[in-house]
From Swiss-Prot:
The gene is rnasel3. Ribonuclease. Angiogenic. Plays a role in host defense. Exhibits strong antibacterial activity against Gram-negative bacteria but mild antibacterial activity against Gram-positive bacteria. The RNase activity is not required for the bactericidal activity. It comes from Danio rerio. Strongly expressed in the adult liver and gut, and weakly in the heart and testis. Changing Q5R: In allele ZF-3d and allele ZF-3e. This is Ribonuclease-like 3. GO terms for cellular component: extracellular region.
Length: 149
């Protein structure tokens, strides 16, 4: 195999290892999990039950135990992603955490009854707060907390 063919094969493998989002597959998986767990522009206080059930959000990813509390950011993924691409401030105590410069509307779904999916019942509460997320490169992969200002 010639040098040009080797180079082409290496470039092809490199491209195949990157997702359509432009990040490595493992970061893509964590980003997509973050979106499923914490980002939904259409959620309201009244729809916590349905959204938690449809997205199968449980205490542990492979279990059926109801999750006690889950926070949804009422926005789209691109808007939330701006926290990692210049719209957030790096936290001094953890270099991977960024606080949004602007507030987001969030819906906090708190378990009110039930123990196991799909019998979990939630109460939703809307608030406005800055969000703190972990970023891997330009991609949010973990919701840390919301901060009321």
């Amino acid at each position: 195999m010639g040098i040009h063919q080797c180079t082409a094969v290496v470039l092809l493998l490199l491209c195949a290892s990157l997702s359509t989002y432009g990040q490595p597959a493992e970061i893509r998986r964590r980003y997509e999990h973050f979106l499923t767990q914490h980002v939904y522009g259409g959620i309201t206080e009244q729809t916590c039950d349905r959204v938690m059930r449809q997205r199968r959000i449980t205490r542990f990813p492979t279990g059926n135990d109801c999750k006690e509390v889950n926070t949804f950011i009422q926005a789209n993924g691109n808007h939330v992603r701006t926290v990692c691409t210049g719209g957030g401030t790096r936290q001094t105590d953890n270099r991977d955490l960024y606080m949004s410069n602007n507030q987001f509307t969030v819906i906090t779904c708190t378990l009110r009854s039930g123990e196991r999916h799909p019998n979990c019942r939630y109460r939703g509460k809307e608030s406005s707060r800055k969000i703190v997320v972990a970023c891997e490169g330009e991609w949010p992969t973990h919701y840390e907390k919301g901060v009321i200002v």
